[in-house]
């Protein structure tokens, strides 16, 4: 493949856009650098770049595009919004319809509020938890990304009982000291942190199924222990379901796992490809939010008709029979094919998969936390990424990210991808 136009456009982008990209994950820094491929259009399971190259897409915009690109039902909803006005600044019937759909799908959502991104949703749940409890600190888990607000850009201290340190320039140490970070899937470290800081903790923020250092499932009993220990200390439990809501079933990961948090943050899939976030939870907690309560949250674009109509349409597609069975069947096919080639080539590969989402780690170690994910071979992944790209398979340019199968992928797409993996593995 030739990427002449992509390279030229990237050079131009560098002159006008910081780093040439509008989100650092879109750069190829984590896979050795170079110009990222510039895409021109997308349809179904495929991308076409500015040089005319075609790709099978497993990026799915980092998760939102579960139906495939330009799904006709969602496209029609967006066209309807364009024709009737995309932004009112007033209440609309669509936000009521959509809120009811979310509540019906995820029973823990007694009340809901729409925002514009997953970052906003998480940020606001923390503010509401602080208002409800009168406390300031939060506990989060190492490697779990919760957006780019200051309070969640915090790395772990030297141990589970120590306070965090800033994970980005521009985050004050004073804010980092409001955060305790502990290893995911480690009940004892969490218990130790809560024994020390529990009376000051407003909320525990957790991905019920991790999506941000790869797909990682909770160990049996982990989430139950988080709920019990947090509630014993008087803290709330917030599930970050920005990636997981409607990813594995019609509803949240909490439905699949059979355990409910106090509040939930959502985004990505629920917007049907348009910008969106939502948060919700117990009524007594949510009534802390203005105009009913003292916790302020607002947004010019929040609940806009375009995002509401796209989200409604997306959920209508996902509610159809056989949707998640299709994703699971293709996911199992892809996992089996990759592992067969890995064994044949003698490569250290571990796959974490749930239904249509999987992560390929270049390690023989079982990956259950961030430290184990970090030990996977990033150099090997970088070579693999570029070999797959040359064969027309588009993956996320990071060893930590998931591959997302969409409703538009076919068995032929999976078969081609498996063959491409085999060719790539033989060159590693």
Swiss-Prot record:
Reaction equation(s) it catalyzes: (S)-4-amino-5-oxopentanoate = 5-aminolevulinate
Entry cofactors: pyridoxal 5'-phosphate
Entry's EC annotation: 5.4.3.8
Chief location category: cytoplasm
Gene Ontology molecular functions: glutamate-1-semialdehyde 2,1-aminomutase activity; pyridoxal phosphate binding; transaminase activity
Record-linked CDD domains: OAT_like
N6-(pyridoxal phosphate)lysine: residues carrying this PTM: 268
Subcellular location: Cytoplasm
Annotated Gene Ontology cellular component terms: cytoplasm
Pathway annotation from the record: Porphyrin-containing compound metabolism; protoporphyrin-IX biosynthesis; 5-aminolevulinate from L-glutamyl-tRNA(Glu): step 2/2
Protein keywords: Cytoplasm, Isomerase, Porphyrin biosynthesis, Pyridoxal phosphate
HAMAP family: HemL_aminotrans_3
Subunit structure: Homodimer.
Family the entry assigns: Belongs to the class-III pyridoxal-phosphate-dependent aminotransferase family. HemL subfamily.
Protein name (database record): Glutamate-1-semialdehyde 2,1-aminomutase 1
Gene encoding the protein: hemL1
